[in-house]
Amino acid sequence: MTAEPNKPCQIKRDYQQLINLYPATAHTDAHYLSKLSIYQQRVFEAHSQQKLLILGQIGLGNGLELLSWWRTQANPSQRLLLKVFEPNPINAYELKSLWDQSLTLVKETPFEPHLESKQASALECKSKLSQLAQTLLDAEPTAIIGCQRLIFDDGRTTIDLHFGDIQTQLSSLTHSPMHPVQHWLILPHLLQALYHQSQWQMAKLSDDSATIATIGLSESSELSETTVNRFQACGFTVSDINELGTKALGIHQPVTLINHQPDAVLLHERQVLRQQDAKAYAFNPMAAILSSPTQSSIAIIGGGLASAHLTLSLAERGQGAQVFCKDAELGQGASGNRQGAIYPLLTTENDELSRFFQQAFLFSRRRVQALTSAPADNQTPISHNFCGVLQTAHDERSQLRLDKIIQGQPWPSEIAYAVDAEQANAIAKINLDKPGFFYPLGGWVCPFEYADAAIQKAMQLADVSVSLNTDILAIERQADGWVLLTEKERFGPFAQLVLANGAELTQFDASNKLQISPFRGQVSHVPAQFQLSQLATVLCANGYLTPSHQGLHCLGASYVKEPEHLDFCSQEQQENLMKMHESYPNQSWLEDIDMSGNNARIGVRMVTRDHFPMMGCAPDVAKILEDYEQHQLTKESRHYWQTTPAPVHQGLYILGGLGSRGLSSGPLAAECLAAQLCGEPIPLDKETLCKLNPNRMWLRKLLKGKAL
């Protein structure tokens, strides 16, 4: 783990509180583990023909069931997506404390001759469970509300941790018709906490033949009858894992894993719920699902972080792609900086923007770790350092704004915590003499190496090709798909086309009306010397300053809207220096910043007014304006825009507008678009997906009955 575990702010709950909130399902001995293993093996066997198996679990408990699902997955050609819903968020430190103080994940039991083989099997899997537990801890789950997507083994295993009120989490998700939940496991301590509405939301997300299993249901006839009746009323069949085996029955007691005769009336009720969802969010059209995982299915224009991570997310699903980059190398646009800060954008209200950036930052951080620990062959290492990010104010106004953020929420300490001036100095290893807000899991990453590593891994996993020095000048929609045109060549047709080309995002007729603006940024490169070279964390105030990498610090960045040129600017170089002087006045290390070499890099980032990236279907703006002539400024028009799918260019998608925080937001936005294109569950709630939609600026006004 990167952040120091001995900080008193990291663990706020003691062991007794933890075991009350996250109880073990049963005595974790050989008897229970054997039953659990048999049950989970049967689930995988029942769905062995599926390339992707979606499982749901209500409750985290002590984590044993989650780890056991992971361990039991044996089919190398099948991917697993496990969605775990837990009302009480927990972080890696508390999870480790829970496991450490309970001594073992699988408790030893007295030797019993008739159970010798089961006990031996349980002990054999103990080592594997411990390895998986450490892998999970290394992914740094944090105690935030919402979904955290954890991807392991190059996409073979994905775990979605949905923390927060279960009803809220379930109802916020969209149904995936191609890949619904096939089976649910409900931990017993949450059985009675599942209200009728939650059960119907589970049904909405489920396959028509999906079933439910729980543990210990048969021990209480009253609870059994009540629970079974409630779930049967939603179209489920319910089984008890404990019925799998006893000394007398062995392992032959059946557990229902597929509901072969679902009630037609109850299935209709589920469909009504799905239709209600679809109607309520009709203005936010989703991507058309790819029919087959062939390379010719999809083209991606762009060679930076967005296109690279979309390619990787598709490749993890077995989906090939053709990538077109106008430069001689990847990462030559906004992704070309030597170092970029990676940390979440937080708001006082912890609104959708703040929650998205927490999810996205953590996802991106895990991507860096995964590409570092299991790189592709001959992959260039990703230069990075998760040394934390220290945010401080630079004037009275910014201090008030920062104080509001700090005091606005009980932020999980693994996300950020306040430090006084003395602590800030100790973290930075240079004198700042002012308080701040420290993001312990943040740091810096080399963006172009990050993009290249993602592409290299994608090429290892799927049929991916990259065409460099290929400047796409025009795109055309034809009957059989999208055609891409250069000055001399023609590519396609492609069923799906994604524009992820950064500063050139608006260059085509189909995208030139996107409400997004280019901003020039000049990043100064200054030699590491004297006190300055001791800087040990990323500083963020009026501008940012990174620790040294290969003898240079990055200091930036200018922010010029719609720039006229991308040449070096001496004035912007001096402005970058002055920002540091304004942020940390009278500090002696400022004299160590030597700008005389005029060493800098200039790039353009595309920025949206609301700071969300753009991800989703490309809006057909001409058609929106045409429809607006017929439906405007009335109550009926608001209903029309609410319930009518917004006009889009079929098969064309946007992935961009990453702004200054693309390292944090880009990989998750790419993952969500890949999930849409492949018809898989998306790790974001419906409201956040609306915020990411490229049509949002127009639809926001139309849904309120305002003029465009």
Curated annotation (Swiss-Prot):
Its needed co-factors are: FAD
Region FAD-dependent cmnm(5)s(2)U34 oxidoreductase, annotated ranges: 301-708
This protein's source sits in the domain of life called: Bacteria
Region called tRNA (mnm(5)s(2)U34)-methyltransferase, residue ranges: 1-278
Q: Where is it located?
A: Cytoplasm
Q: Which cellular component terms (GO) are annotated to the entry? A: cytoplasm
Check the record and name the InterPro entries matching this protein: FAD-dep_OxRdtase, FAD/NAD-bd_sf, SAM-dependent_MTases_sf, tRNA_MAMT_biosynth_bifunc_MnmC, tRNA_S-uridine_synth_MnmC_C
A GO biological-process term: methylation
**Enzyme Commission number(s) from the entry:** 2.1.1.61, 1.5.-.-
Question: What keywords does the record list, in alphabetical order?
Answer: Cytoplasm, FAD, Flavoprotein, Methyltransferase, Multifunctional enzyme, Oxidoreductase, S-adenosyl-L-methionine, Transferase, tRNA processing
Q: Which reaction(s) are listed as its catalytic activity? A: 5-aminomethyl-2-thiouridine(34) in tRNA + S-adenosyl-L-methionine = 5-methylaminomethyl-2-thiouridine(34) in tRNA + S-adenosyl-L-homocysteine + H(+)
Q: Name one GO molecular function term.
A: oxidoreductase activity, acting on the CH-NH group of donors
Similarity comment: In the N-terminal section; belongs to the methyltransferase superfamily. tRNA (mnm(5)s(2)U34)-methyltransferase family.
The record describes the protein's role as:
Catalyzes the last two steps in the biosynthesis of 5-methylaminomethyl-2-thiouridine (mnm(5)s(2)U) at the wobble position (U34) in tRNA. Catalyzes the FAD-dependent demodification of cmnm(5)s(2)U34 to nm(5)s(2)U34, followed by the transfer of a methyl group from S-adenosyl-L-methionine to nm(5)s(2)U34, to form mnm(5)s(2)U34.
Q: What is this protein called?
A: tRNA 5-methylaminomethyl-2-thiouridine biosynthesis bifunctional protein MnmC
Tell me what organism the protein belongs to: Shewanella baltica (strain OS195)
